[in-house]
């Protein structure tokens, strides 16, 4: 009922100003300058987000920043409160969510240092809450069977790709990302299995975040950085965590440039129809709707 009223209210508006939520790695706020910066400790029905929400503007566009693993990177992937993170972005009024991820590669076509905008996911996690509608006290009512095709908002994906092209950064235009439970890395046997399944890249944080954003009715897309080859590739030694962090820090400025360019370009367009479609998708997939 609440979601239906939100959709009806939005339909009465001619245009909807966008607000971009950015979820990324630790210390995300340091390389991105925000005007009118404010920090908010947001409460949600699912507990606290990973950190405070940093609210502000990038070139006049309203944005929110959140460090997925905490600003000190002290939350392991399985313990991230994905529901609280996405819900907090919704509560802050975000119309879109752009995220950054680190990927390890299962294919020769994705080499360390490459940027990728994935187009699909395989969820191989087992310990993470997958839905807001779990029947628990304080959770929203109902059972929602949200469709996951397409996994990401295609229009938002294309803006990330266009921004990377505008800046001259070679970027993979698609890829299937398998999300591991972590925190360990996978074995050679697992790598071979994942490759047979059609996975191109591995992550520890993309799911259930992408699923929850869809369930929240928020257009969502990922900009990933390939940090290492997985152990299936005998031509390269296994990368250490310190080496992976080094590669990410070395390339983080390029990630931020792509995000800022994409945000600027997105703000120049009318997103009213896309925002409403994302909300209507959720409203039309409740099992107990009348």
Curated annotation (Swiss-Prot):
The keyword Chaperone is annotated on this UniProt entry: no
Any one annotated GO CC term: cytosol
Its job: Purine nucleoside phosphorylase involved in purine salvage.
Localization annotation: Cytoplasm; Nucleus
Subunit composition and interactions: Homotrimer.
EC numbers: 2.4.2.1
Binding positions for substrate per the UniProt entry: 204
Family the entry assigns: Belongs to the PNP/MTAP phosphorylase family. MTAP subfamily.
Binding-site positions, phosphate: 68-69, 205
InterPro entries registered for this protein in UniProt: MTAP, Nucleoside_phosphorylase_d, Nucleoside_phosphorylase_sf
The protein's enzyme class: transferase
Sites marked Important for substrate specificity: 186, 241
UniProt-listed Pfam families: PNP_UDP_1
Comment field (misc): Although this enzyme belongs to the family of MTA phosphorylases based on sequence homology, it lacks several conserved amino acids in the substrate binding pocket that confer specificity towards MTA.
Catalytic activity from the UniProt record: a purine D-ribonucleoside + phosphate = a purine nucleobase + alpha-D-ribose 1-phosphate
Alphabetical GO biological process terms: L-methionine salvage from methylthioadenosine; purine ribonucleoside salvage
Pathway linked to the protein: Purine metabolism; purine nucleoside salvage
Protein name: Purine nucleoside phosphorylase
One annotated GO molecular function: S-methyl-5-thioadenosine phosphorylase activity
């Amino acid at each position: 009922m609440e979601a239906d009223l939100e959709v009806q209210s939005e339909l009465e508006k001619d245009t909807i100003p966008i607000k971009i939520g950015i979820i990324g790695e630790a210390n995300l706020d340091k390389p991105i300058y925000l005007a009118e910066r404010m920090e908010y400790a947001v409460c949600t029905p699912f507990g606290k987000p990973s950190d405070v929400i940093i609210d502000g503007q990038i070139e006049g566009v309203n944005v929110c920043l959140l460090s997925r693993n905490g600003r000190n990177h002290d939350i392991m992937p399985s313990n991230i409160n994905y529901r609280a993170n996405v819900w907090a972005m919704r509560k802050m009024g975000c119309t879109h969510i752009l995220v950054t991820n680190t990927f390890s590669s299962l294919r020769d076509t994705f080499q360390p240092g490459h940027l990728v905008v994935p187009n699909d996911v395989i969820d191989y996690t087992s310990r993470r809450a997958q839905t807001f509608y779990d029947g628990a006290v304080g959770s929203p009512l109902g059972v929602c069977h949200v469709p996951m095709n397409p996994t990401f908002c295609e229009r938002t994906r294309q803006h990330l790709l266009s921004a990377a092209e505008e800046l001259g950064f070679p970027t993979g235009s698609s890829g299937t990302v398998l999300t591991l439970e972590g925190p360990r890395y996978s074995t050679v046997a697992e790598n071979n299995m994942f490759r047979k399944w059609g996975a191109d890249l591995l992550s520890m944080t993309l799911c259930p975040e992408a699923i929850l954003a869809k369930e929240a009715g928020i257009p969502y897309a990922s900009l990933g950085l390939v940090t290492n080859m997985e152990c299936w590739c005998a031509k390269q030694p296994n990368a250490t965590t310190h080496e992976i962090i080094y590669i990410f820090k070395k390339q983080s400025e390029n990630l931020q440039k792509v995000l800022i360019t994409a945000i600027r370009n997105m703000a120049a367009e009318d997103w009213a129809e896309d925002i409403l479609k994302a909300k209507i998708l959720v409203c039309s997939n409740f099992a107990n709707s009348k």
